[in-house]
Amino acid sequence: MAKPRVYELAKVLNVDSKTVLEKLKDMGEFVKSASSTIEPPVARRLKAEFAKDNAKGDSKPASSAQKPAAKPVQQRRPAAPSAPASTSSSAPTPAAPARQASPASAHQQAPTPGAPTPRPQGGARPGMPTPGRHGQHDNRENGRDNREGRENGRQSRPNDRRNNDRRNNQGRPNNGQPGQHQNNRDNASAPRPHAQGGAGANGGNAASNAIPRPHAQGPRPGNNPFSRKQGMHTPTPGDIPRPHPMARPTADSGRGGRPGRPGQGQGQGRGFRGGRPGQGGQGGPRPGQWGHNRPGQGGGSQGAGQGGARGGFRGGQGGGNNFQGGGAPSNGPARGGGRGGRGGAAGAFGRQGGKSSKARKNRLAKRHEYEELKAPTIGGVRIPNGNGQTIRLRQGASLADLAEKINVNQAALVTVLFHLGQMATATQSLDEETFQILGGEIGWNIQLVSAEEEDKELLQQFDINLDEEELQDDEDLKPRPPVVTVMGHVDHGKTRLLDTIRKTNVIAREAGGITQRIGAYQVTVNLEGEPRKITFLDTPGHEAFTAMRARGAELTDVAILVVAADDGVMPQTVEAINHAQAAKVPIVVAVNKIDVPGANPEKVRGQLTEFGLVPEEYGGDTMFVDISAKQNLHVDKLLEAVLLTADAELDLRANPDMDARGATVEARLDKGRGAVATVLVQQGTLHVGDAIVAGTSYGRVRAMLDENGQPMEAAGPSTPVQVLGLTSVPTAGDLFLVASDDRAARQIAEKRQATERAAQLAKRRKVVSLEDFKKKFAESEIDMLNIVIKGDSSGSVEALEDSLMKIEVSDEVGIQVIHRGVGAITQNDVNLATVDKAVIIGFNVRPNRQVADLAEREGVEIKYYSVIYRAIEDIEASLKGMLKPEYEEVVTSHSEIREIFRSSKFGNIAGVMVQDGEVKRGTKCRILRNGVATVNDLEISSLRRFKDDVQSVKEGYEAGINLGTFNDIELGDIIETFEMQEVERK
């Protein structure tokens, strides 16, 4: 079926293409645009994901619909008053207790059961709204509801308590009798001071019939004329308060005091704005204004002295002629009071009163955050202390990665590191030592994840378990051939032994007669009439191929140590023993060249005993076999010993039915086939068409070849095979595995590349400390020989680079490999060498004609080698030639002064006899007087023989010497001439 495109799927799913692209990204699929195609399995997964999301979305409303709704507050109509308003002397009707408002409806103002409905005062015209009674009550009721909705989320004001207070403040005294509050609970809990005079009470009763009393409503939203509408309703003519014509402030009237401080007021009220109770606070709208129906800034009072509903704005302790907080005003003299409290609406000239609760909350939150910061200040920055917590970072991590983990600023970490004596940028990769120093200072235990753990975590993201082979059942395991590595010193006959076993002649094709790459072969031998397969790995014996020998020891099951009977144990023999013992691999010793004159196999046995290889005839457990690979003597006994050792000490079984896994033995770049990797399958079976990942290389297996170049369809465990189809040349020793598809293989390879690049940067970018700053400047003056290495195989390039980096000539010169690669020398290599003034080394590779012409035009030197030790010798000689020359002083002549001639034009002229050597004009000289050098830095400015100017005078001749302006010479002085000659450095 055809592959669907993204926009087509978006149409089918009834979503836009952007949503589909984001969903694909979340699923781990990388799609470029909406017109890109995707695989049918991915499309099915995508549809399933959308179906799952839709199912989740449908279940949410259903679940929410099942929740019971909050029980509404029961609305009750207010009961009719028990007596008409005219009967003021009748007993008051007790008010029913207010119902507790539920949290769901805390903002609703339910009328109190049993409370009387507000009625117009006598004298008001029927049908006309009385100011401060019905119209003001209704409009302000709406404004208060709006305000309560806005202030519902403020944490600093308790909603439930405030709403209850507002409801209770609406209570009016029944039958016109002041002092009877409608909320019994509030009256019982709030302290009420005694009335300080009866005049106030009587005056309050008289005034209650003439002047309408304002209701205790919510605070005014604000009166800033420069701001937009602040929640206030549009006033109607009946709502506009009219000042009393006789309202004038008296001298004794005072303003309300600060809430929370007892004053001189008559009653006990509570400020409305801010929700904080105030002691006293009976101030009216303005001091001494009678008849003003606008609630003042004083708190509510309880009638005249003790009664009255609480209401009004938050205010203070005023008393006297002011409004009594919504109660009856008193006609008596003002009782004084303090200054008005904080709060109030924002005015035209800025906000008055204290800061808002939001600002207080932010200040408290900042204070809390400040107290949480317990780390010491380092360099002016404050970083939270980790208290020894452990944090894991990847290899090559930077300060930016650490800052993201512990949630601090990157610049702060840079500052701390600078004060610790280290200089690094926020994005620079750091090593483990620097992270440990920084972590110890800020209280964090920083650990860098090893490369193996990081790779294991990466593979687990793609459902690949590297420990799967340890969890195999015994029924799934089947026998596999042993992997045998042939190791030993160079020219001891390793490749000759393999040629004899395979009946081939590989050694004739090796440059210089030495092996410079790992060869993998599989042969079939007969053991007791039964055919058995053995996989052989031939490792180089030259000292430059240490990494190859170590790699071969890690991949092998049994090691054959080849030792020449005439040479005995050599340095690379000891190294091979150490590699095998480190890998815990059993060793079978093959004493070769027993047919050569001077061969002494017993000497070899005695030498190897010192390294823990004791022969069986000496009471040990190591098998020794005397062979001659050239004459094919006892080779069959050697193979028999290998198989017996493998059967006795090893469990050679593997599961051939799982996905293939193994190691890359060798890799090269073929001109016609591309990247060719020789791999050894260790688990499972590798098939043509599998998607594989080898290190940072990936691809699909296009073809597989055996060691003879014959195509193969499948390769089982312990089978060496050449794989074609990789996008790049992998590194020798990289593990390979089979991925689920090409996309997963590419993602694994790309993430490995990023990890490897970061690790290399961490090693290359050494953090410069302040103490080493001068040292780094001195190192910048070192002459570096830049080299570009190109070779035919990955292992050869690696071995050549390691060998060149080990060359130590002097501290004044060094080697820097700016690029290395596998394959022919390309134009990019020449361009890179041109910029960096580098030398290109071609190991078994050549450039084409165009690249060679370009290198000649640019003056780039290309050196070709086929044997590794010749390349090492030439580079070492080049480094010695780069050394700065050293000079030493060489005495050339001695001349005795026998006469002094004085000249007004030239000064003193010494007549000398040359005793030895040759005197030359312009050479340096010194004066020796009685065997002591009086003056050193002199120069022979003129040299004459009689009247002729000469260049030199030899031994036994007389001459006249003028020393320029120096005239302090005496008879008998010796003029010694010398030269500075360059000395060859070693």
Swiss-Prot record:
Residues 479-651 form the tr-type G domain. Residues 49-59, 135-168 have a biased composition (Basic and acidic residues). Keywords: Cytoplasm, GTP-binding, Initiation factor, Nucleotide-binding, Protein biosynthesis. Residues 488-495 are annotated as: G1. Residues 49-370 are annotated as: Disordered. Gene3D superfamilies: 1.10.10.2480, P-loop containing nucleotide triphosphate hydrolases (3.40.50.300), Translation factors (2.40.30.10), Translation initiation factor IF- 2, domain 3 (3.40.50.10050). GTP binds at residues 488-495, 538-542, 592-595. Residues 60-112, 170-182 have a biased composition (Low complexity). Pfam families: EF-G_D2, GTP_EFTU, IF-2, IF2_N. Belongs to the TRAFAC class translation factor GTPase superfamily. Classic translation factor GTPase family. IF-2 subfamily. This is Translation initiation factor IF-2. The lineage of its organism: Bacteria, Bacillati, Actinomycetota, Actinomycetes, Bifidobacteriales.
